[in-house]
């Protein structure tokens, strides 16, 4: 996986801002004229996952089986004699995820209902590590990633798999709030944390009662988050989602047919659990519920809603972030961020096999306001 980061800073004219006690910034201090952005800064590309990603060396199946014996039945040599699983088998993929969570992150209980998304963990972990870098503060000559419960993160659309809270909690000790429009997803997320008593108090869930909103109805008055995360639904309809699944199945079949090109664990297609009643291997094998796969207007409309609503919570969140699957949606999203006067916008590009995923991050706080935020948080 390679990544590059683009950063745009928009400086506004100085003006008076009045913030109430115990508030780092006020909304009025965020609504000032924006000048032209500075030049784009690029980070050096890397062919690997994030340096802190536990999956940089692929999958150690022998160790995974030892940690999670249920995986053993699905592990077998591939055409080159290396241990692997059939990534077209949704049960095998789910067992692999459970093993990875147990071995690398100490998550003893993890399960999802049939038909819900089963996320590829290495890529999800990369998102967590990259957004952690946004929070890094310089201490002497080194940068420090803040850890522990003082850092609060909001996961929009946490899903039944609740993967981002699990990875963020076990990697950095952060506290999470997970929201979702699906009651079944919320119930399963709660069940997962109930089954992991050592971290059960680090996660709370909130049902989004209105699917037309993202932050409204979730973020409470005077509540503060250091980060928001989101993996938006990227299809505009069920038909479009089905077409996308069909393409994945076709590509997977083509790759399996090429015995001379065995994929490494890091570039395997993302396995997603199919419904248990589906006996036809040609039907949706990558799974996913409606809210996980599509929404009216697709990814772009979801991004627009998220960005517009983020302005209403400008002083309550340090960094807003989201994955962007479709490259063509980046420019419209950035244009909207410029329109609502985001102070700084970053684009982080991540590669996993042939798939390119981008993280879009933005903040309404000026650098000095961010410093005050950190001081206030760490003093609590």
Curated annotation (Swiss-Prot):
GO terms for cellular component: cytoplasm. Keywords: Cytoplasm, Methyltransferase, rRNA processing, S-adenosyl-L-methionine, Transferase. GO terms for biological process: rRNA base methylation. Residues 1-54, 260-279 are annotated as: Disordered. Residues 44-53 have a biased composition (Basic residues). InterPro entries: METTL16/RlmF, rRNA_lsu_MeTfrase_F, SAM-dependent_MTases_sf. Residues 21-32, 260-270 have a biased composition (Low complexity). SUPFAM superfamilies: S-adenosyl-L-methionine-dependent methyltransferases. It is an enzyme of class 2 (transferase). It is found in: Cytoplasm. Belongs to the methyltransferase superfamily. METTL16/RlmF family. One of its GO terms (molecular function) is 23S rRNA (adenine(1618)-N(6))-methyltransferase activity. It catalyses: adenosine(1618) in 23S rRNA + S-adenosyl-L-methionine = N(6)-methyladenosine(1618) in 23S rRNA + S-adenosyl-L-homocysteine + H(+). The keyword Hydrolase does not apply. This is Ribosomal RNA large subunit methyltransferase F. Disulfide bonds: none annotated. The lineage of its organism: Bacteria, Pseudomonadati, Pseudomonadota, Gammaproteobacteria, Alteromonadales. NCBIfam families: PRK11727.1. The keyword S-adenosyl-L-methionine applies. Pfam families: Methyltransf_10. It comes from Shewanella pealeana (strain ATCC 700345 / ANG-SQ1). Its EC number is 2.1.1.181. Specifically methylates the adenine in position 1618 of 23S rRNA.
């Amino acid at each position: 996986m390679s990544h590059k980061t683009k950063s745009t800073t928009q400086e506004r004219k100085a003006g008076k801002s009045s913030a109430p006690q115990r508030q780092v910034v006020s909304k009025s201090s965020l609504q000032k004229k924006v000048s032209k952005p500075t030049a784009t800064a690029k980070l050096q590309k890397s062919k690997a996952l994030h340096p802190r990603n536990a999956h940089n060396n692929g999958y150690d199946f022998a160790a995974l089986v030892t940690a999670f014996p249920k995986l053993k039945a699905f592990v077998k040599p591939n055409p080159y004699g290396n241990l692997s699983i059939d990534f077209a088998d949704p049960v095998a993929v789910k067992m692999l995820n459970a093993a990875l969570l147990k071995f690398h992150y100490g998550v003893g209980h993890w399960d999802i209902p049939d038909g819900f998304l089963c996320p590829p963990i290495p890529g999800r972990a990369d998102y967590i590590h990259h957004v952690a870098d946004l929070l890094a503060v310089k201490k002497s000559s080194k940068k420090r990633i803040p850890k522990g419960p003082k850092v609060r993160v909001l996961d929009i659309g946490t899903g039944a798999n609740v993967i981002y809270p699990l990875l963020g909690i076990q990697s950095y000790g952060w506290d999470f709030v997970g929201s979702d429009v699906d009651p079944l997803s919320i119930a399963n997320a709660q069940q997962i944390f109930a089954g992991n008593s050592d971290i059960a108090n680090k996660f709370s869930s909130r049902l989004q009662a209105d699917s037309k909103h993202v932050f409204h109805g979730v973020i409470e008055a005077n509540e503060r988050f250091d980060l928001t995360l989101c993996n938006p639904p990227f299809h505009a309809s069920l038909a479009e989602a089905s077409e996308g699944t069909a393409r994945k199945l076709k590509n997977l079949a083509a790759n399996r047919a090429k015995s001379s090109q065995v994929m490494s664990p890091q570039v395997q297609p993302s396995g997603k659990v199919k419904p248990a009643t589906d006996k036809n291997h040609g039907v949706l094998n990558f799974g996913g519920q409606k809210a996980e796969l599509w929404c009216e207007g697709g990814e772009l409309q979801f991004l627009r809603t998220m960005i517009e609503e983020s302005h209403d919570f400008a002083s309550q969140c340090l960094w807003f972030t989201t994955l962007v699957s479709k490259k063509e949606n980046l420019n419209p999203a950035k244009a909207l961020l410029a329109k609502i006067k985001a102070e700084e916008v970053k684009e982080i590009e991540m590669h996993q096999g042939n798939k390119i995923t981008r993280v879009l991050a933005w903040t309404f706080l000026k650098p000095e306001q961010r410093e005050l935020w950190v001081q206030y948080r760490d003093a609590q």
